[in-house]
Amino acid sequence: MANIIEGKLNAEGFKFGIIVSRFNSFICDRLVEGALDTLVRHGAADGDIDILRVPGAFEIPVAAQKAAASKRYDALICLGAVIRGSTPHFDYVCAEVSKGVASVSLDSGMPVSFGVITTDSIEQAIERAGTKAGNKGTDAAITAIEMVNLFKVI
């Protein structure tokens, strides 16, 4: 039988950086609340969590890159909300943010979870920030916890 290796959901002793956009703060603040609650419930100490605020979602990857290079963190959690408007700007921002965050993770070898919600409406964003569709900040924090534990054993 094959060995199954997976990360545990224990945040104790790890340092986390949460990188969050200020734009659409009424949504992003809920994502941060979900991430913080999840990290603490899984054993992270308040002093082991930093929140790095950036102006918008487009700035998340470069802040994540700098945070990863600092070696201060065991994992990063990227949070933001991009809501479709009437121009193609949405498509460009979404594509670059997702590619940028993935690139930081691959280049640094550090777990970098993606909790940037991309929606067609404010209603959809609200649903994904703690109402009907759960909280994507919570999901991103769980991913970071699991991955940092997996990286510890592989």
From Swiss-Prot:
For this protein, what is the EC number?
2.5.1.78
**GO biological process entries:** riboflavin biosynthetic process
Gene Ontology terms for molecular function: 6,7-dimethyl-8-ribityllumazine synthase activity
Pfam families recorded: DMRL_synthase
Gene3D superfamilies per UniProt: Lumazine/riboflavin synthase
Q: In its UniProt entry, what is this protein called?
A: 6,7-dimethyl-8-ribityllumazine synthase
| Superkingdom field | Bacteria
Q: Which CDD domains match?
A: Lumazine_synthase-I
**Its biological function?**
Catalyzes the formation of 6,7-dimethyl-8-ribityllumazine by condensation of 5-amino-6-(D-ribitylamino)uracil with 3,4-dihydroxy-2-butanone 4-phosphate. This is the penultimate step in the biosynthesis of riboflavin.
Q: Where does 5-amino-6-(D-ribitylamino)uracil bind?
A: F23, A57, F58, E59, A81, V82, I83, F114
Q: Which pathway does the record list?
A: Cofactor biosynthesis; riboflavin biosynthesis; riboflavin from 2-hydroxy-3-oxobutyl phosphate and 5-amino-6-(D-ribitylamino)uracil: step 1/2
Which residues are involved in binding (2S)-2-hydroxy-3-oxobutyl phosphate? S86, T87, R128
